[in-house]
Amino acid sequence: MKGIKAFTLAEVLITLGIIGVVAALTIPSLVQKYKEQATVTRVKKFYSAFSQAYTMAINENGTIDTWGLEDSEIDVDEDGNSGYSDSSLEQYEKFFNIIGKYLQKVEYEPIRNTRGKGFVMSDGTQIIAIWLQPSRCTGNGINHSDTYCGDFYIKTDNKPARKDDGTFNSNVFVFNINPYRIFPRGTDNTEFKDKCLSGTDMSRCTGWLILNENMDYLHCCLLYTSDAADD
């Protein structure tokens, strides 16, 4: 049509360049946000399913302190390496043999970089470690529902569970066990700040993820650490 000018090659290239810059700035952020939300969904799904299974196990078998379990122990081998004792690994398996039948599907198989075996849920979530302390877990009424009976760690992908310095990566989450329920670690404000926000133990971010349904703590750790160093 007369009176309408086409874009010049230079204008087209400039426009494409601007689009490319915007995409380069926004797409990584969108991908990261998507991955974080997928992790949130997986952890919350696990928490819901495992909580229900634990409740059913209690209803049929009594509280965990009556399951005939022994306290977990650490052994040190001749090279000075520490790890769960053989008896502790047996208790680990015994615990999940009881609770596993209340879950849709649990596979018991070797887990990379851990001694012995671990449990893998149907969606690939790995239960990589458990620490049982039934001797501290009395189950004496609902008023004692926060009694510590142990804790366990899950991993949401196949990336390493630990950083080079030995601390947990952000793909690891920890839950406490008490006589009547499980609950996420890191709901205590002091623990959340000292462990999660400082980056010294990312597994203690679990409480934030469950309560707030996001992983925004990943984007404020450096800021918190910097502020703490300035105090």
PLM feature spans:
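Low-complexity, acidic interaction segments enriched in glycine
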Residues: 97, 104-179, 184
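Alpha-helix exit/C-cap motif
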Residues: 51-70
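N-terminal single-pass transmembrane signal-anchor helix
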Residues: 3-35
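Extracellular/mature segments of secreted proteins
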Residues: 145, 203-206, 212-214
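Short amphipathic secondary-structure patches
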Residues: 69-118, 122-123
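Aliphatic-rich helix starts adjacent to a transmembrane/signal segment
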Residues: 29-50, 54
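Conserved small/polar residues in nucleotide/adenosyl-binding loops
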Residues: 224-229
